[in-house]
């Protein structure tokens, strides 16, 4: 019998789905319940019923599961950024291990016992205030005061969040102070519906090891009224290395515009990642959790098993940090990235490290186009590292990888589902999946990364 909307029942949550919803079974149908924890006994109301499954909401928790804890953030539910703050961190790690295992078993069709699968790699003492970058939308609260926060799920309604647990305390304090200065100067937040108002976002970045700090106002116009005083005040009060203005006048939800100018300081901050020196403005992609990223990079280097005479190809390389962190262990590195600023940054870092182009070079190209060209030219890298976006590798990239026939392929993925899909294709083309290592780069959120090691079967 099919479940009906508004039907109420009592049930026990068995586990979590890949989007961190609780999963229960009622009358033979799966019911997905946001905010539930494994082992919870709940009274659940069906909010949407489909043919073979349904979605529910918790009306009451009759008995909490062993991993449920009281959230330490008052707005984590409407904000939605911390989808797992109602779980103990140990339970969260178990769940994330399960997310990755399920992706490879169900979507990839793998027998998980056929390769080395490890529990999630996590820094248990580094689960709060870990973000080195935040982009906060600016708006008005119910009383008309200027606030920052995060968008409620599937909306552009700002949930005020003056004390986010994921970002450093100075970023929270600066956001509060900036809102007060904007309000005192009569500077209105941008209104998406009317296209009026001035300030769209506050963008902050921190060099985790260097301690350098960046602030950027994203504005609907050329600048801010009383700009010099506002920027100087914030620079002095929060020891900012640099302050910038980004101009974005487009009627769009894209955060950054193309034009950025420096108000104070050098316009960039410096840091290191896995020993690689980095310069960052606002456009460069950079891992937001530095210590956890260094853990991930170490695992990727371990999986690469580089030899001194190897040619390493780094696809979707960003600012080149993964490949450059491995360069001391190989002869030649080639990186490919589609974002021009990232490629220029990678070349600058390579030059700073004293690496000539014949040892480390970077190309601004689509990964698929570059891989196809290299394959057609007869390139045979010994090791290929890929770090694709959430959509995974495209067919051109995967086909070219097979043609180039690297001894080892290391895949770093922010989406276990597409990683499993791509690994399945590669296994059908002569590769063996050797190892899968989940890594928690985003504690208290639903996201989990993984690192794969694949080898060519002829070896």
Pin down the residues of each PLM region.
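Extended interfacial segments that mediate partner engagement and assembly in macromolecular machines
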Residues: 59-70, 77-189, 209, 224
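Carbohydrate-binding surface patches
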Residues: 203-207, 212-223
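Short, acidic/hydrophobic/Gly-rich beta-strand patch recurrent on exposed beta strands
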Residues: 22-27, 149-152, 216-218, 346
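Terminal RNA-binding accessory module
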Residues: 1-75, 111
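Short, conserved phosphate/pyrophosphate- and ester-handling motifs at nucleotide-, phospho-/glycolipid
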Residues: 39, 167, 289
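Short beta-strand micro-motifs enriched in acidic
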Residues: 36, 45-49, 137-141, 205-209, ...
């Amino acid at each position: 019998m099919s479940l009906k909307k508004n039907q109420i029942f009592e049930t026990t949550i068995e586990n979590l789905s890949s989007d961190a919803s609780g999963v229960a079974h009622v009358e033979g149908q799966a019911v997905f319940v946001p905010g539930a924890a494994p082992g919870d006994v709940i009274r659940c109301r069906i909010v949407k019923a489909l043919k073979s499954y349904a979605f529910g909401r918790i009306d009451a928790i009759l008995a909490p599961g062993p991993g449920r804890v009281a959230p330490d953030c008052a707005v984590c539910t409407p904000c939605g950024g911390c989808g797992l703050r109602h779980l103990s961190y140990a339970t969260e790690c178990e769940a994330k291990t399960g997310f990755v295992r399920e992706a490879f078993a169900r979507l990839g069709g793998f027998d998980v016992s056929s390769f080395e699968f490890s529990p999630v790699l996590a820094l248990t003492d580094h689960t709060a205030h870990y973000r080195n970058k935040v982009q906060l939308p600016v708006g008005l609260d119910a009383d008309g005061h200027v606030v920052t926060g995060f968008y409620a799920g599937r909306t552009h309604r700002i949930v005020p969040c003056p004390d986010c647990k994921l970002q450093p305390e100075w970023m929270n304090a600066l956001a509060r102070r900036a809102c007060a200065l904007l309000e005192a100067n009569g500077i209105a937040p941008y209104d998406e519906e009317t296209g009026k108002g001035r300030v769209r976002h506050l963008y902050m970045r921190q060099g985790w090891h260097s301690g350098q700090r960046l602030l950027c106002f994203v504005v609907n116009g050329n600048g801010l009224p009383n700009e010099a005083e506002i920027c100087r005040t914030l620079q002095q009060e929060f020891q900012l290395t640099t302050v910038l203005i980004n101009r974005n006048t487009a009627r769009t939800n894209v955060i950054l515009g193309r034009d950025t100018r420096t108000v104070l300081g050098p316009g960039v901050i410096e840091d290191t990642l896995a020993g690689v020196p980095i310069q960052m403005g606002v456009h460069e992609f950079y891992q937001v959790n530095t210590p956890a990223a260094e853990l991930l990079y170490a695992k990727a280097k371990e999986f690469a098993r580089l030899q001194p005479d190897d040619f390493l190809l780094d696809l979707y390389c960003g600012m080149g940090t993964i490949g450059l962190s491995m360069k001391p262990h190989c002869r030649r590195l080639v990186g490919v990235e589609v974002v021009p600023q990232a490629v220029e940054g990678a070349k600058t870092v390579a030059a700073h490290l004293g690496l000539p182009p014949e040892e480390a070079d970077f190309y601004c190209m689509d990964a698929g186009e570059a891989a196809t060209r290299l394959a057609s030219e007869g390139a045979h890298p010994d090791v290929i590292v890929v770090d694709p976006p959430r959509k995974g590798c495209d067919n051109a990239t995967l086909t070219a990888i097979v043609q180039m026939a690297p001894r080892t392929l290391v895949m770093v993925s922010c989406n276990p589902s597409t990683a499993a899909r791509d690994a399945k294709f590669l296994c059908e083309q002569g590769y063996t999946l050797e190892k899968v290592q989940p890594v928690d780069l985003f504690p208290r959120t639903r996201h989990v990364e993984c690192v794969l090691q694949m080898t060519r079967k002829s070896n």
